[in-house]
């Protein structure tokens, strides 16, 4: 049997196919290259040939030992929190870890994706995660930990798998319930920026309504949006090759335009090495902030800097 263990991202793939093996080989090669000597491009400003500024953020896991700031990343674009739940971290442990992250970030934005039982259904740990959360929409202790840690820095919290405005309202209600409980107990809290992960076609279509009901940030998970739009849920590796499908780009364009009309920032998140080549199309649609895996940051920066946008 063969397997791919990605300790950086907390994933395990058993019996990987050829595409997955090639992708990992590329990541390993880039990692070795980056470890040999700093690339001078990392220190250059994020500007296209046409003079358009863009911003790079880095993707990481909540259970990582350090807050990474490498290859010119301007902040932490997405912090995945599932690994912390799988390690059975208590509310106090999560609060302490989040405070460490925010203090180490030194004022730059930290965007955390909440744990959701419906997210990443194809991940190896999905069944265990859903069993542990007992079917809850959100993990209450995590929301409480986020509110308690918020005063330490620039925290943004985004909710995945939101299908429409009513679903968004339920997320807000759970946050408000936790806030009321903590305040009534005399616990110091802060209110982070709250946003929505656009990973379902219905969320993209209802983005304007979601923003009108309080979403302050739109984070587009391009690979998941592609999977759900094109019916590739059970073949996730195929989504990477379809990121520029016209149907997907039309949904993204709609979200970007609706967000621009409301001055709401838009991120593209979860960019892997294999997805880098598609990102110029998203730049042309108006996306200016890209959150990428560490190995993808430099290749992405170099490619975007070559664009005439």
Q: Residue spans of the language-model regions?
A:
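Conformationally flexible catalytic loops at phosphate/diphosphate-handling active centers
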Residues: 1-7
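Metal-dependent DNA phosphodiester-chemistry modules and their immediately adjacent helices/loops
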Residues: 8-9, 17, 245, 306
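Beta-strand/loop-dominated core regions that host nucleotide or nucleotide-derived cofactor-binding catalytic loops
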Residues: 9, 16-18, 24-28
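Short acidic/polar capping segments at secondary-structure boundaries
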Residues: 8-11, 18-19, 61-63
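Short linear motifs in exposed loops
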Residues: 15-16, 57
């Amino acid at each position: 049997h063969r397997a791919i263990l990605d300790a950086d991202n907390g994933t395990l793939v058993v019996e990987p196919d050829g595409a997955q093996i090639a992708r990992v080989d590329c990541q390993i090669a880039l990692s070795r290259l980056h470890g040999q000597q700093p690339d001078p491009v990392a220190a250059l400003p994020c500007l296209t040939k046409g003079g358009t500024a863009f911003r790079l953020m880095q993707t990481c896991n909540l259970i990582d030992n350090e807050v990474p700031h490498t290859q010119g990343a301007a902040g932490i674009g997405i912090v995945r929190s599932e690994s912390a739940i799988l390690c059975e971290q208590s509310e106090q442990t999560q609060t302490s870890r989040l405070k460490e992250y925010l203090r180490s970030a030194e004022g730059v934005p930290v965007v955390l994706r909440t744990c959701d039982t419906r997210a990443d259904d194809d991940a190896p740990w999905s069944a265990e995660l859903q069993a542990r959360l007992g079917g809850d929409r959100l993990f209450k202790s995590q929301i409480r930990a986020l509110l308690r840690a918020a005063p330490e820095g620039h925290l943004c919290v985004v909710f995945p798998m939101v299908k429409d405005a009513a679903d968004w309202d339920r997320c807000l209600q759970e946050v408000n319930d936790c806030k009321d409980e903590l305040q009534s107990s005399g616990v110091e809290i802060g209110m982070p920026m709250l946003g929505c992960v656009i990973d379902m076609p219905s969320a993209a279509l209802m983005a304007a309504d979601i923003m009108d009901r309080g979403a302050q940030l739109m984070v587009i998970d391009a690979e998941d949006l592609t999977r759900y739009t094109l019916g590739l849920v059970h073949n996730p590796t195929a989504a990477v090759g379809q990121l520029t499908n016209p149907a997907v780009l039309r949904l993204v364009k709609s979200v970007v335009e609706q967000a621009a009309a409301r001055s709401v920032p838009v991120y593209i998140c979860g960019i892997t090495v294999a997805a880098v080549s598609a990102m110029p199309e998203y730049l042309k649609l108006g996306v200016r902030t890209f959150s990428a895996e560490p190995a993808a940051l430099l290749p992405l920066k170099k490619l975007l800097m070559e664009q005439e946008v």
